[in-house]
From Swiss-Prot:
InterPro entries: L-lactate/malate_DH, Lactate/malate_DH_C, Lactate/malate_DH_N, Lactate_DH/Glyco_Ohase_4_C, Malate_DH_AS, Malate_DH_type1, Malate_DH_type1_bac, NAD(P)-bd_dom_sf. Belongs to the LDH/MDH superfamily. MDH type 1 family. CDD domains: MDH_glyoxysomal_mitochondrial. The keyword Oxidoreductase applies. The active site is at 177 (proton acceptor). It catalyses: (S)-malate + NAD(+) = oxaloacetate + NADH + H(+). Catalyzes the reversible oxidation of malate to oxaloacetate. Its EC number is 1.1.1.37. NCBIfam families: MDH_euk_gproteo (TIGR01772). This is Malate dehydrogenase. It comes from Haemophilus influenzae (strain PittGG). Keywords: NAD, Oxidoreductase, Tricarboxylic acid cycle. Homodimer.
Length: 311
């Protein structure tokens, strides 16, 4: 099994490289790529950690050597948010970066499972899909927006608020990966009794948690460490699925189009990537209303990505 990280010299990428070196199964090959010349050094650095994961680093304009033979590709390349920016402000720069990298994926490892971390995910996943489609290699079972950080934050905040064991707290999060499109299904959390006045503030805190980190870092970065852990968890789940284990994760994929062309919901992962898209289950009145309210925003985000490729 080979996992490639594109954008491995960045804030998320370096932390992700470390976590994957520690957490991937023994015998996995880990390829680290970034345009920055420091990248082979990042690979040497993590290669000194004693685990049976083999690491190689690549830098320069062309990611092809890192992509050759890859089963899983994680894309975290791009610019990060700064105070006053929202994820959509990143679009102008990151859209072109994702397009360029996916064009290489389409040529070099078209059957790989691709996890998009680069924001704005609602839009960059649509860009990736259209590039793969133009190349004639699009398989919707193999393209994912990594929304796992919304799940991690939900688990953390719910466990804190309700005094639950965080390792046993599970919160499905549906929709997209920015602002109002992030919808934690708090009504489905086991062992949590909710007062009406708790739901809305907690939902808003989860939706705005990325901004909380950006502001707290005072211009010094965005959520890199928690995002890296979220991406590492998703990568481990993908690798388990590809190896024949049954794993369920919430992730942003192209499904039946009931709510939007791309939508984050629980997905059973397997040997072909998406094995089955699971139902979102019963919603509270608050959640149903929030879902209906977010859809125009989510659909517009997706359309922006489609138009970026198709004009």
């Amino acid at each position: 099994m080979k996992v490639a990280v594109l954008g491995a010299a960045g804030g998320i990428g370096q932390a992700l490289a470390l976590l994957l070196k520690l957490q991937l199964p023994a015998g996995t090959d880990l390829a680290l790529y970034d345009i920055a010349p420091v990248t082979p050094g990042v690979a040497v650095d993590v290669s000194h950690i004693p685990t049976a994961v083999n690491v190689k680093g690549f830098s320069g304009e062309d990611p092809t050597p890192a992509l050759e033979g890859a089963d899983v590709v994680l894309i975290s390349a791009g610019v990060a948010r700064k105070p006053g920016m929202d994820r959509s402000d990143l679009f102008n720069i990151n859209a072109g970066i994702v397009r360029g990298l996916i064009e290489k994926v389409a040529i070099t490892c078209p059957k790989a499972c691709v996890g998009i971390i680069t924001n704005p995910v609602n839009t960059t996943v649509a860009i990736a899909a259209e590039v793969l489609k133009k190349a004639g290699v699009y398989d919707k079972r193999k393209l994912f927006g990594v929304t796992t950080l919304d799940v991690l934050r939900s688990e953390t905040f719910v466990a804190e608020l309700k005094g639950l064991n965080v390792s046993r707290t599970s919160v499905p999060v549906i929709g997209g990966h920015s602002g109002v499109t992030i919808l934690p299904l708090l009504s489905q959390v086991q062992y949590a009794k909710w007062n009406e006045e708790e739901i809305e503030p907690l939902t808003k805190r989860i939706q705005n948690a990325g901004t909380e980190v950006v502001n707290a870092k005072a211009g010094g970065g965005s959520a890199t460490l928690s995002m890296a852990q979220a991406a590492a968890r998703f990568a481990r789940s993908l690798v388990k699925g590809l190896s024949g284990e049954t794993v369920v994760e919430c992730t942003y994929v192209e499904g039946d189009g009931k709510y939007a062309r791309f939508f984050s919901q629980p997905v059973r992962l397997g040997k072909e990537g998406v094995e089955e898209i699971l139902p979102i289950g019963p919603l509270s009145n608050f959640e149903q209303q929030a879902l209906e309210n977010m859809l125009p925003t989510l659909r517009a985000d997706i359309e922006l990505g489609e138009k970026f490729i198709n004009g």
